[in-house]
Design a protein with these regions (language model features):
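Glycine-rich, acidic and aromatic/proline-enriched surface loops and short helix-turn segments
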Residues: 10-19
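Generic structural signal for hydrophobic residues
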Residues: 8-9, 82
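Short, small-residue-biased leader/transition segments that mark boundaries at the very start
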Residues: 2-5
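Domain-terminus/edge residues, biased toward the C-terminal soluble/receptor-binding domains
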Residues: 18, 22, 33-256
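Conserved short loop/turn motifs at secondary-structure junctions
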Residues: 27-33
Length: 256
């Protein structure tokens, strides 16, 4: 297993686009020219970790923890302190991992959250731990001051869409996802305008999940992006007897 794990790690690295990384062991302590990575690749790996397993931040954000070490000779309590000093020294820092070797020097992959943004800062090759954390804090400061995000948390209610030749007269609609727009370079997002684009009517059959239209987001006349509007339920095409029944209903109700 010890020999097989680096093979799997290298395969996974390729899947993540870590093209400048090669693992020769599973602990990262090999002092070899064939065992290497880059800050960009560490950032890709870290992003994959916190996106797939966000609960890791519940643990990496702990500054101190009381641990009980149990052996055959008995148990002994001791205090475990986080090696990531940014947890206590930088507001919003919630992780992630420090590391150091004689060849790599002092390294850290740090995560911080502020104003609905999550930032990753990776530092490698620092001469000491103070420089490592100072550089990471500077990267955070630059990132948070340069970026802002718009999230549409107050989505407008969607109308029901008229359906022709369907067993139902209308179709339910729903948003495909929550709209988010990231502005970089210090750009300030102005007032956002939303426009719902839908046809006046559609013909059955309709399948749940198919695209019905979209919502377009603009600020200062520039389009920020859009989100698809999907059908929220199936609408089957009406048969002859369905149409006959509908006609008779309209006749007796005086709407035909």
């Amino acid at each position: 297993l010890h020999d097989a794990l680096p093979i799997w790690m290298n395969q996974k690295a390729k899947e993540l686009g870590m093209n400048d990384t090669k693992f020769e062991d599973c602990c990262g302590l090999t002092d070899s020219d064939g065992h290497y990575t880059t800050a960009a690749d560490v950032a890709k790996m870290s992003r994959e970790l916190i996106e797939r397993f966000p609960q890791i931040l519940n643990y990496s954000s702990i500054w101190m923890e009381e641990i009980t070490h149990v052996t055959q000779k008995g148990s002994k309590p001791f205090t475990l302190t986080n090696t990531n000093k940014l947890i206590r020294g930088y507001e919003g820092c919630v992780g992630l991992k420090t590391g150091s070797t004689s060849k790599a020097k002092y390294c850290v992959s740090a995560v911080a959250k502020k104003n609905d943004l999550t930032m990753l800062a990776v530092v490698m090759g620092a001469p000491d731990y103070k420089v490592r954390f100072a550089d990471a804090a500077s990267l955070f400061q630059y990132g948070f001051s340069s970026c802002s995000i718009y999230i549409d948390r107050e989505r407008d209610p969607l109308p029901e869409l008229s359906v022709v030749y369907g067993k139902q007269d209308t179709a339910e609609l729903e948003y495909a996802e929550e709209f988010r727009y990231l502005a970089t370079g210090g750009t300030v997002i102005g007032e956002v305008e939303k426009t719902i684009e839908l046809p006046e009517e559609v013909q059955a059959p309709i399948q749940k999940g198919e695209c019905a239209g979209r919502v377009v987001y603009k600020a200062d006349g520039e389009e920020l992006g859009s989100v698809a509007i999907l059908y929220g339920a199936d609408v089957a095409r009406a048969g002859m007897w369905d149409l006959f029944g509908c006609t008779m209903k309209q006749y007796f109700l005086g709407t035909a």
